[in-house]
Amino acid sequence: MDIPILFRDARFVVLDKPAGLPVHPGPRGGASVEDIFPSLSRRRDGPWLAHRLDADTAGCLVVALRRAALHEAQAAFAAGKAEKTYWAVVEGGPDADAGTIDAPLLKVSDRAGWRMRVDARGQPAVTAWRVRGRGAGIAWLELRPRTGRTHQVRAHCAALGCPLLGDPVYGAGQGRLHLLARAIRLPLAPPVAAEAPVPAHMRAALAACLSPAATTGGT
């Protein structure tokens, strides 16, 4: 398995995780990001996932190459200092061009499975967003989550009235999930920063949202 590397130093690697690949094996096994760990480092104290992405989310994934680096990264995430940027294509689109969603999220389960729901009893969750472009029945959003809840971007977009294109849990679920972990920055010494290119399955939808930069992976 070959996963592109977006950033590397002695402490960290930032991978360009492909959509559809889980970060670790499920109960039934199968391929995962962890399969390439031996090729990243042979140290006894690493590598480690510094955070997680949903299997169907593409883009920046930070891997710590040693335990001390893992603790640094975890502290940055816990303190809300990690700067994360997501690109998403959503169904419809918000009326405004920018805003902030401040809506706590609670995990709920039923016979169909589990999901996150906006609920006052949930954990605090805040996501800033802006519209980068609009197309016919879709919109391209840039989102900056200020907290790190499970499914936060997906659940917040649904709460905004515009679920992600291809989201089987919070939207219609037709086609592939259009969500990219576009960029990440950890303000460490030295900093860790990377930007992921647009995956092939998102290019047409982003181009339809009127931005020529979308098809080349530019900003």
Stretches with model-predicted labels:
Residues 1-126, 133-135, 178, 183, ...:
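RNA pseudouridine synthases
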Residues 24, 141, 165-167:
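Thr-Gly-centered strand-to-loop micro-motif
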Residues 51, 144-146:
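Surface-exposed loop and edge beta-strand positions of immunoglobulin-like domains
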Residues 67, 146-147:
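Loop/turn elements at beta-strand to alpha-helix junctions within RNA-recognition modules
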Residues 136-144:
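Short histidine-centered loop motifs in beta-beta connectors
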Residues 149-157:
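Short beta-strand segments enriched for Tyr within beta-sheet-rich domains
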Residues 157-197, 219:
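Phosphate/ribose-recognition catalytic cores of enzymes acting on nucleotide-derived substrates
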